[in-house]
From Swiss-Prot:
Designated name of the protein: Valine--tRNA ligase
Domain comment quoted from the record: ValRS has two distinct active sites: one for aminoacylation and one for editing. The misactivated threonine is translocated from the active site to the editing site. The C-terminal coiled-coil domain is crucial for aminoacylation activity.
Catalytic reaction(s) noted: tRNA(Val) + L-valine + ATP = L-valyl-tRNA(Val) + AMP + diphosphate
Keyword Manganese set for record: no
Taxonomic superkingdom: Bacteria
């Protein structure tokens, strides 16, 4: 088939993706091969592809495709997450646009709307991943709320409850007033804010002098919930308050002064207002001293009846109003500018409210004890390893996980309340009824007598089971698939969910499988724009990935992403990198067309230059292939791509093909041509994981392939020789230096390539065996070893050997002298500038060492060039 003159991704990508699907080349079933398994970090079911997904899934696809070519049984499992908070918020907004409130609907009615929304918008992102070339086993596509996953979640909840690890109780939680649900500690993001510190006057009850204590607080709106004041017993300045009672400003509630060394003597005035219902630390003091708790907030962040004042007003409006009212009452001593960290909901970006609430919790210490050692001793490896410390810190400071959410979209908690109080926990209503009858001794109970908990589970409670539940390891422990595919091989994810997801998967993996869920974790960086800003919709600096693919092709975008993605570091993404990727596609395409355009002539033998070229490139390719394998083993994928890129662009295209290219209108010998096709095949294998579409197209074009059998580069073995003639490769670097210098002389002296030159080697020729290559590449008449160079010759050094090119009458001597004198003048001026800088004592004393070293190198380079120019000018003037 005739190959188009230009590479057009649109002609290639859809065609080959469909071919791979039709021949089920992404499919995996347990067999005798070594498994290679990756589970996709499930994106939100209603999400759309963004640059972070592009990076993450490009990396996963590279790893999976490489494993396939290594002969492993590669299984990449896709799926989506039900994303309770995000999805419910979208459904609520959609209903609101139709004039419907969530509170107007029954749970079942709301869930019908949620399922409709999910079916309409769900899975879009997985379809978009196909455009990227993602080679997932789509038959295995899972959803965290599908039947199999739901059964797994409920079974685990019941099991952990029966083990005494899940409990229900009133605790201080992070409350999201917008989503109207509790959050885990990991779902709270702390942001630095510039606010005020309010100094409030608490009058001492019955004090004849009318004295008062002053309390510093950032939250004056919570004084309605104050039930004590606390001082440090070792604080002399507040000792006069011991045993006293004070009056809460505006509220006029009398509260005791208690003593505890928890109070920081240096903060504010050393007096602390204690609000047990709305501060985590105050809650602990309340528990310790048996203080009452007054919850002054409604779930939506407005003040409740219990507050007594400002009822129904928003908490932040109250803060503004209470400042005025306190000041008017003479109860505000002063305010100061103050910077502190405020907790925000990760999902809704509103300030969270610490709140006492009845919730379900999972005890975490048991899990942390199992999950910390394997990471710290590198049984389970993190790339980059710096994230081990982040992981350790969290594990060593673990807190119980609040797993209940006041939402309807999600896995409903399988707890059923009994008519006379108490509850039972069971995976199904039928089991719950049987347990209820047994617990109450009332055989007449029916399902109508039981009331299931309204709350649902934290989304992460389903996704922590992902590597196990995808292979049905919870419902059917020890089945063929879980035994074969688990533990999975690699996890590719962002460090922002190391606690939410990575750590918890490790925990539950040891709990239910007795081993880690994956062998390696590769943490990607954050995708930023070229100015270093995080990509976001609000900044408008995040390109549409699908538009990038349409413009540059999937291979171009994949390559652009990976060129910008050093392992574990943030990615400074620039469209120019995708353009570089597209240009590389064109380079590959044109090199292929060049080779396939040659005519094989069986009547000619390989030239000496071609034999040397083949021997060199075979070693060079094997050397780079070994380097790439080593880089893959260290997850340095960007460097691996760059190594293959340079091998193809520089070594293969710029050097090898130039060395073997037949003269215009002539044929090429069969031996060299066969070797070249073999090299090209190897290069396509090395490039395929990074650039699957163009490599498949060209591989299919190389020879007649069996399309009916689904023959494909994707499942073609990556097998390369390991032999490297190291000395030969090193010598060839010298040869390249010689050729490059001769080419520079032609360029500088404006001598056409068709004009043959002579080369003189002074002393001894260290690369004499490569003379045929040098002669061909530089169009040389001869290479001779001499004791001294010809008058007027242009010379250069490669290593310790001097080479000279006699120019004779090839140049206009006067013009060349004028050119070199102009260059000499420029270089001398440049050198003076450098010397002036280096003679400046202030610069020498203050400049970083690297800058000084750079300036000294500039000096040395300029002096060397000046010396060479003077010598050349003198030689020309003599001639």
């Amino acid at each position: 088939m005739e190959l188009a003159s230009k590479y057009n991704p649109a002609d290639v990508e859809g065609k080959w993706y469909q071919y791979w699907l039709e021949h089920r080349l992404f499919s995996s079933k347990p067999d005798g091969r070594e498994p290679y398994t990756i589970v996709i970090p499930p994106p939100n079911v209603t999400g759309v592809l963004h640059m972070g997904h592009m990076l993450n899934n490009t990396i996963q696809d590279i790893l999976v495709r490489r494993a396939r070519m290594e002969g492993k049984n590669a299984c990449w499992v896709p799926g989506t997450d039900h994303a309770s908070i995000a999805t419910e918020a979208k459904v609520v907004n959609k209903l609101a646009a139709q004039g419907i409130k969530k509170t107007d609907l029954t749970r079942d009615e709301f869930l019908k709307h949620a399922w409709d929304w999910t079916e309409e918008h769900g899975g879009i992102i997985l379809k978009q991943l196909r455009k990227l070339g993602a080679s997932c086993d789509w038959d295995r596509t899972a959803f965290t709320m599908d039947e199999e996953r739901s059964k797994s979640v409920l079974k685990v909840f019941v099991d952990l409850y029966n083990k005494g690890l899940i409990y229900r109780g009133v605790r201080m939680v992070n409350w999201d007033p917008k989503a109207l649900t509790a959050l885990s500690d990991e779902e709270v993001i702390y942001k630095e804010e510039h606010g005020k510190l309010f100094y409030l006057r608490y009058k001492v009850e019955g004090d004849p002098e009318g004295r008062y204590a002053v309390v510093a607080t950032t939250r004056p709106e919570t004084i309605m919930g104050d039930t004590a004041m606390c001082i440090n017993p070792n604080d002399p300045k507040n000792a006069w308050l011991k045993g006293k009672k004070v009056i809460v400003p505006l509220v006029n509630r009398v509260i005791p002064v208690i003593e505890d060394d928890y109070v920081d003597i240096e903060f504010g005035t050393g007096c602390l207002k204690v609000t047990p219902a709305h501060d985590v630390n105050d809650y602990m003091l309340g528990e310790k001293y048996n203080l009452p708790s007054i919850d002054i907030f409604n779930d939506n962040g407005t003040l409740s009846e219990a507050a007594g004042l400002y009822i129904g007003m928003d908490r932040f409006d109250v803060r503004k109003q209470i400042e005025k009212d306190l000041d008017a009452a003479g109860l505000l001593e002063k305010t100061e500018a103050y910077t502190n960290k405020v907790g925000y909901s990760e999902r809704t970006n509103v300030v969270i409210e610490p709140k006492l609430s009845m919730q379900w919790f999972l005890k975490m210490q048991h899990f942390a004890d199992m999950a910390l050692p394997p990471v710290m001793n590198d049984e389970l490896k993190f790339y980059p390893a710096k994230y081990k410390n982040t992981y350790r810190h969290w594990m060593e400071n673990i807190k119980d996980w609040c797993i209940s959410r006041q939402l309807w979209w999600g896995h409903r908690i399988p707890a059923y309340f009994l008519p006379e109080g108490g509850y039972v926990v069971a995976a199904t209503p039928e089991e719950a009824l049987a347990k209820a009858k047994e617990k109450t001794g009332n055989a007449a109970l029916t399902m109508d007598d039981l009331r299931q908990d309204e709350d649902c589970l934290d989304t992460w409670f389903s996704s922590w089971l992902w590597p196990i539940s995808l292979f049905d390891g919870i419902n059917h422990p020890g089945n063929e698939e879980i035994s074969y595919y688990y533990p999975t091989s690699d996890l590719v994810t962002g460090p922002d969910i190391i606690f939410f997801w990575v750590a918890r998967m490790i925990m539950v993996g040891y709990e239910y499988e007795g081993k880690m869920p994956f062998k390696n974790v590769y943490f990607t960086g954050i995708v930023r724009d070229k100015l270093g800003r995080k990509m976001s919709k609000s900044l408008g600096n995040s390109p549409d990935p699908l538009e990038l693919i349409d413009k540059y092709g999937a291979d171009g975008v994949r390559m652009g992403m990976m060129l910008a993605a050093p392992a574990g570091n943030d990615i400074l993404f620039d469209d120019a990198l995708c353009e570089q990727g597209r240009n590389f596609c064109s380079k590959i395409w044109n090199a292929f067309r060049l080779i396939k355009g040659w005519t094989v002539d069986d009547n000619i033998q390989a030239s000496d230059a071609a034999k040397l070229a083949v021997h060199w490139f075979e070693s060079k390719q094997n050397e780079v292939a070994a380097e790439v394998a080593d880089l893959f083993s260290k997850y340095r994928l960007s460097e691996a791509l760059m190594a293959v890129y340079k091998l193809f662009w520089d070594e293969f295209s710029s050097w090898y093909l130039e060395m073997i290219k037949p003269a215009y209108g002539q044929g090429i010998d069969r031996t060299t041509y066969s070797a070249t096709l073999c090299f090209l095949d190897n290069l396509l294998h090395l490039l395929h994981p990074f650039m699957p579409f163009i490599t498949e197209e060209l591989w299919q074009q190389m020879y007649e392939r069996n399309a009916e059998e689904g023959e494909s580069l994707m499942v073609s073995a990556l097998s390369m020789d390991t032999y490297v003639d190291t000395a030969f490769v090193a010598q060839f670097e010298v040869v390249k230096g010689v050729i490059s210098n001769i080419r520079s002389i032609r360029l500088q002296k404006n001598i056409a390539q068709k004009e043959p030159l002579d080369l003189q080697v002074l002393g001894e020729n260290p690369v004499a065996e490569f003379n045929a290559v040098i002669q061909k590449m530089c169009n040389l008449s001869s290479i001779t070893v001499v004791e001294s160079k010809a008058e007027g010759a242009s010379s250069f050094m490669v290593g310790t050997t001097e080479y000279a090119v006699p120019l004779g009458n090839m140049i206009d001597v006067e013009a060349e002298i004028a050119r070199m004198e102009a260059e000499l003048k420029h270089k001398e001026g440049f050198l003076q500038g450098v010397l002036k800088k280096l003679s400046n004592e202030k610069f020498i004393n203050n400049a970083p060492a690297a800058v000084l070293e750079m300036e000294r190198k500039k000096q040395a380079d300029a002096e060397s060039i000046i010396s060479s120019l003077k010598e050349s000018i003198a030689a020309l003037k003599k001639a």
